[in-house]
């Protein structure tokens, strides 16, 4: 299968399951039980896949720092497809994430040929106002790529770690591809890694919610994260089968390796370009090791984790641990040791002007189909509903939408409808019905022929009109609140 993903075309993916094997995306349903109060997109299998979301779920459960990052190219009307991404940004922010939103004006300039002024107008009037109206909090950062010095500087550094052959393999670039288009790709990677810069609190898990067409950006960035890091932490085995941790630092300053050795208690061996941590971890080791974390918030977080392990261990006695309990406690101690080591490694790297990026996590959501079937396209007004459409016109679009019903009323009653092929039901699934039980009831009534397309369209049209009216009122309130938000514009 050659399922080429292109961030700049209107993708039409018909079999999402094939993406699991071809691109290494994991099924989201496997991790769903680990997520506290999952979003409706998660519960309804609209989000179908992920990479490394385990670390985000753990951060939400434990209160560890994490970020959500996403971006929008200011190239047209903000519509329901963009709302899906905005909803996920806002949800993660509510769950404790520090939020970063980039307006990809460098991409719009290089790929679409838009002027900087037009990028700013579309960025504010379409995307930023709707993002705030949907609940984005002022604590988050919104920026235009062209005005964000940290992103531009990081993009330049990342550019030294990737060549034209790699970009061609990932994106299909040719000799006709402009240099600015290639630079915009490095800028996208910088967008994704920016939340882990020291000025934003340093190394932490970051999630990027995307459609599968944006996965090339994630694959590139994950590779670049490893290339940029001063050190990498590996789990290794001795000849006898025992486990130990090793910090590899090819090209790292000798002074950085020596400083790192000082901050790891117990049995440690320093080589020319790496350090082996040979100490068998236990409570005493963890209690000493955690004190080597300089950042108070992170140190306190790990102290809490160590206390939880100790509480479990004490509760398991008397008389003694079962074999399972011993394994469970050892596993927690080992995992916590690795996490503390990564924290200390990140701090030492920063002290010596290096990086310690964690490869970004990502979630993948299904595309919405067009209202008339086929692909949703910003260039075809009747295929999508813009968040700035007149509410009455939005309702009319719903009433003109393609359904999954039969040709005649009699056939519908006899054979039932096909809600999974219906763009009207899809609107309710994605956006218009919050209650899962109500949605399930609508679906079953359609399948068994007791609900007709006319009543569904009427319900969806009314809800769409109500949503657009409410959203546009909130957009006007957002316009008045813009000064309360951290927004970096192009100077």
Swiss-Prot record:
It is found in: Cytoplasm. Its main location: cytoplasm. Residues 295-349 are annotated as: Insert. One of its GO terms (biological process) is tryptophanyl-tRNA aminoacylation. Keywords: Aminoacyl-tRNA synthetase, ATP-binding, Cytoplasm, Ligase, Nucleotide-binding, Protein biosynthesis. A motif ('HIGH' region) lies at residues 74-82. Belongs to the class-I aminoacyl-tRNA synthetase family. HAMAP family: Trp_tRNA_synth_A. This is Tryptophan--tRNA ligase. It comes from Methanosarcina mazei (strain ATCC BAA-159 / DSM 3647 / Goe1 / Go1 / JCM 11833 / OCM 88) (Methanosarcina frisia).
